[in-house]
A protein has these predicted regions:
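Histidine-rich, glycine-flanked metal-binding segment
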Residues: 1-4, 9-56
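Divalent metal-coordination and catalytic microenvironments
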Residues: 8, 28, 50, 61, ...
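Metal-associated gating/positioning segment near the N- to mid-region
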Residues: 48-113
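Active-site mouth loops of central-metabolism enzymes
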Residues: 60-73, 96, 122-135, 204-208
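Alpha-helix-loop-beta-strand connector modules within alpha/beta enzyme cores
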Residues: 103-120, 168-179, 332, 336
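Histidine/acidic residue-rich metal-binding segments in metalloenzymes
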Residues: 134-304
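His/Asp/Glu-enriched, well-ordered alpha-helical/loop segment
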Residues: 200-228, 294-298, 302-304, 309-384
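C-terminal cap of metal-dependent C-N hydrolases
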Residues: 319-322, 376-435
Length: 435
């Protein structure tokens, strides 16, 4: 079977392309892209007028909890959430149980993702054994099995000497070190941003300095080792300034930001104590959020990620101090970006596609996907005018801990193609995909 998308606005910054085109998919690849493509016998014709077609979206920071915490999420339910949100590829973080710190653990996730057959699962391997920050993990073995990058996400490597060692080692394999930047001796006990929120709510604060000092340290280690460095879930304006300066210097430094750090702040945490707003790193100031939006717009921050962090109801529906950090995000990321950045003219569709598809694919060392004949048909079609209200019932994820319940947003993925299979059809997940 082949698919013919008629009249889509095709946006691909790799080709300097932003035009209304027809796109024909045959088998696993794009067969033809032109102003007008005539349907062939047997083609499934999809009316894409008014919709945007982009290279498949990539989220390079998700937690699928599999293996070990399947009561929160599994590779299957996480894949369904990813497709529903418009993603063709995700990079899974290694804080599973057991920790993904060896080749067989990486291979398990890839194979399970292939069995589910919805998206490409691109596991990140741990930097250190057990993510304990003490011994180098089996980096080479994990590269051989398909690890996309390396991170001790959730903790960060506390020892500068150990971080230097892992960066020197990873630099041999054409992979990035994705750094969770947090000095735990400074952040210890913190549950909200140190400042207005901690004072107003009477809770222990988590200083921005604890993040910014480690960003600065890791940039210095990048300069020393030459290892490509990716800063995870940046949350402060000062952190963005450090990244901007590193890039100006010519260092191989990239960065990501989450929608919740772009569009929420500590001021949104009220005396209702909505634990879905408890994040790691925490929601910072409104000024930080605006600075991060500007950093996305000017390219300082390369990628939009979700840090998709599913938790069971009992882990969130409790006192703030003991509730778990994090929120789900795969199914709200695209509409949040369209609503708050594109529709407000802070970011073009070209910029959106660059941050949500092109840049993360490049950073993860994945094969480029371009909307041109001969390239793999990993594509996302979305309707930027479709309005959606976020409710618990909206989610395909096993967990419902969204920070945006009740929000009315614009822009939803309607169709997703992975290896030429239509795995999302008219906003409905298709198990195994239409071929």
């Amino acid at each position: 079977m082949a698919f013919l998308l008629k009249g889509a606005r095709v946006v691909d910054p790799q080709l300097n392309l932003d035009a209304v085109m027809d796109v024909r998919i045959e088998g696993e690849t794009i067969a033809e892209v032109a102003a007008t493509v005539a349907p062939q016998e047997g083609d499934t014709v999809i009316d894409a007028k008014g919709k945007v077609l982009a290279p498949g979206l990539v989220d390079m920071h998700v937690h699928f909890r599999d293996p070990g915490f399947e009561y929160k999420e599994t590779i299957e339910t996480g894949s369904r959430a990813a497709v529903h949100g418009g993603f063709t590829d995700v990079a899974t973080m290694p804080n599973t149980n057991p920790v993904t710190d060896n080749g067989p653990a990486v291979r398990f996730q890839i194979d399970r993702g292939n069995e589910v057959g919805l998206i490409h699962v691109r596991p990140m391997g741990a930097l250190t054994k057990g993510s304990k920050g003490q011994e180098l993990a089996e980096i080479g073995n994990m590269v051989d099995e398909g690890a996309s990058a390396f991170s001790d996400d959730g903790h960060g490597v506390q020892s500068a000497g150990m971080m230097r060692t892992v960066m020197e080692y990873v630099s041999q394999f054409d992979r990035v070190v994705a750094a969770h930047c947090e000095i735990e001796s400074i952040s210890a006990g913190g549950v909200v941003n140190e400042g207005r929120a901690s004072t107003r709510l009477g809770m222990f604060g988590w200083p921005a300095l604890g993040e910014e000092l480690e960003i600065s340290r890791d940039i210095d280690l990048c300069r020393l080792t030459g290892c490509p460095l990716h800063i995870c879930h940046i949350s402060t304006g000062r952190g963005a300034e450090l990244v901007r300066a590193a890039k100006k210097e010519g260092l191989p430094v990239t960065a990501e930001v989450c929608p919740h750090h772009l569009f929420l702040s500590e001021d949104d945490i009220t005396d209702t104590y909505n634990t879905n707003l408890k994040m790691n790193p925490p929601l910072r100031t409104a000024e930080d959020a605006l600075a991060l939006q500007a950093a996305v717009a000017d390219g300082t921050v390369d990628c939009i990620v979700t840090d998709h962090a599913p938790h069971a109801t009992h882990e969130k529906d409790c006192e703030w101090e003991i509730s778990y950090f994090g929120c789900i995000g795969l199914e709200t990321s695209l509409p949040l970006m369209i609503t708050n950045m594109v529709r407000t003219n802070k970011l073009s569709y070209t910029g959106l596609v660059r941050a949500m598809a092109v840049n993360p694919r490049r950073i993860l060392r994945l094969e480029p996907v371009k909307i041109a004949a001969g390239y793999k048909a990993d594509l996302t079609l979305f309707d930027p005018e479709k309005k959606v209200q976020i409710t618990p019932e909206y989610f395909e994820s096993k967990s419902k801990n969204s920070a945006f319940i009740g929000a009315e947003l614009y822009g939803v993925a309607t169709d997703v193609f992975v290896d030429g299979k239509r795995v999302l059809a008219n906003e409905v997940v298709v198990p195994g995909g239409e071929k």
